[in-house]
């Protein structure tokens, strides 16, 4: 139990450090602006898609109720009325106008994709037609799937077997649908492998945070009525902006939780200087080169199990940028130059690493081939730098 509690505390700390370091608040602000510009286009596209299917007639109201009742506090009702008015007017747009709405919606999809993949630290992005198809799938399939789920739930609710459970369904079904939507988002958007159960855990946490935020935001709006004195009839607009920003912050926090569930590990007892670790990684690649083979990420994780996966990936990214390594398909890596001609001095010079001191250079392994040359380098450096900072001849009287 104590070990799990220690892991949980370390994991929460990791999530919030990542949230701050990756400037997630700025991402949420950018997505809020994109969201506000694309809100009417998104609703127009969704309504148009559902109108294509006769069986979804009347489901549009239920979809809006699901979104506005479960993802927004009560103040969103005024915004919903105005949005419906704008959507009804947009139905009279020409083909060019409708195309503009679709492009605006796709730009929001692009912002979401870039933000989530930035939080996941994915080295590559979707390109060309794959990117367009992915965005179009997110844009078109989401409203259709939500409408289909609501239509199915309405049908099952009328069955005699489940009629007694209608109260539970009314409360639990929207929450389940939101969890599934977040799970799909956390699995599909990152351009990397995401485990379903970890995406589901992150989605449940995000949905719970949404419920708590919705409750707290409703209290905030009720208690602080000074907004109405300042903004008057347009009070709903700044409040809606604030809520959308809070919503994106929570959603991106869920992305970091999902990322952390894949990458986070409790700190190992063994501490090693980064330059020593990099040299050992390159030494392992030289051994693989002698066997004319590449190394997978799993092999590297197994060999350097005392390193966090995130730390190991960071070293690999640095070695890729310095042209020591080349990345192959399927997260395979190989040495980009002749290993036996590589020297410690070249690695140190090209990477601009900090040289470990003699205490840091010492390893638990008795036959560490790096300790002796690093100790000698430190001694030579100490001898060369053993000069007075300001000599008496250079001091101006």
UniProtKB/Swiss-Prot annotation:
Cellular localisation: Cell inner membrane
The entry's keywords: Cell inner membrane, Cell membrane, Membrane, Transmembrane, Transmembrane helix
Keyword Protein biosynthesis listed: no
Name listed for the protein in its UniProt record: UPF0761 membrane protein Kkor_1635
GO cellular component: plasma membrane
PANTHER family: INNER MEMBRANE PROTEIN YHJD (PTHR30213), UPF0761 MEMBRANE PROTEIN YIHY (PTHR30213:SF0)
Keyword Ribosomal protein set for record: no
Record field: transmembrane: 36-56, 92-112, 132-152, 168-188, 201-221, 237-257
Highest taxon, organism lineage: Bacteria
UniProt topology in membrane: Multi-pass membrane protein
Family: Belongs to the UPF0761 family.
Protein species of origin: Kangiella koreensis (strain DSM 16069 / JCM 12317 / KCTC 12182 / SW-125)
């Amino acid at each position: 139990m104590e070990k799990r509690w220690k892991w949980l505390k370390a994991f929460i700390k990791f999530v919030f450090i990542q949230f701050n370091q990756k400037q997630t608040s700025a991402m949420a602000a950018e997505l809020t602006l994109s969201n506000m510009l694309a809100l009417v286009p998104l609703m127009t596209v969704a309504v148009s898609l559902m109108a294509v299917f006769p069986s979804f007639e009347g489901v549009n109201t239920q979809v809006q109720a699901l979104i506005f009742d479960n993802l927004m506090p009560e103040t969103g009702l005024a915004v919903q009325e105005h949005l419906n008015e704008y959507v009804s007017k947009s139905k009279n747009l020409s083909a060019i106008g409708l195309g503009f709405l679709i492009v605006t919606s796709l730009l929001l999809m692009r912002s979401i994709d870039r933000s989530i993949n930035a939080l996941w630290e994915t080295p590559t992005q979707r390109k060309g037609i794959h990117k367009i198809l992915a965005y179009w799938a997110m844009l078109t399939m989401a409203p259709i799937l939500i409408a289909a789920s609501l239509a199915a739930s309405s049908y099952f609710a009328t069955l005699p077997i489940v009629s007694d459970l209608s109260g539970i369904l009314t409360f639990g079904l929207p929450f389940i649908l939101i969890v599934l939507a977040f799970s799909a988002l956390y699995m599909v958007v990152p351009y990397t492998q995401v485990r379903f159960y970890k995406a589901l855990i992150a989605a449940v946490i995000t949905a719970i945070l949404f419920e708590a935020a919705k409750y707290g935001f409703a209290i905030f709006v009720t208690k602080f009525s000074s907004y109405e004195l300042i903004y008057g009839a347009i009070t709903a607009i700044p409040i809606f902006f604030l809520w959308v920003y809070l919503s994106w912050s929570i959603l991106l926090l869920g992305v970091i939780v999902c990322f952390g569930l894949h990458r986070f590990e409790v700190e190992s007892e063994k501490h090693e200087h980064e330059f020593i670790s990099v040299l050992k990684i390159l030494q392992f690649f030289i051994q693989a080169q002698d066997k004319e083979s590449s190394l997978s990420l799993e092999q590297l994780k197994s060999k350097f199990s005392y390193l966090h996966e995130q730390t190991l990936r960071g070293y690999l990214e640095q070695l890729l940028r310095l042209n020591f390594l080349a990345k192959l398909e399927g997260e395979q890596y190989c040495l980009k130059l002749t290993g036996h001609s590589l020297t410690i001095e070249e690695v140190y010079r090209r990477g601009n690493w900090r040289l470990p001191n003699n205490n840091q250079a010492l390893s638990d392994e008795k036959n560490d081939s790096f300790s002796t040359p690093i100790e000698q380098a430190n001694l030579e450096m100490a001898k060369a730098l053993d000069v007075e900072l300001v000599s008496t001849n250079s001091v101006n009287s």
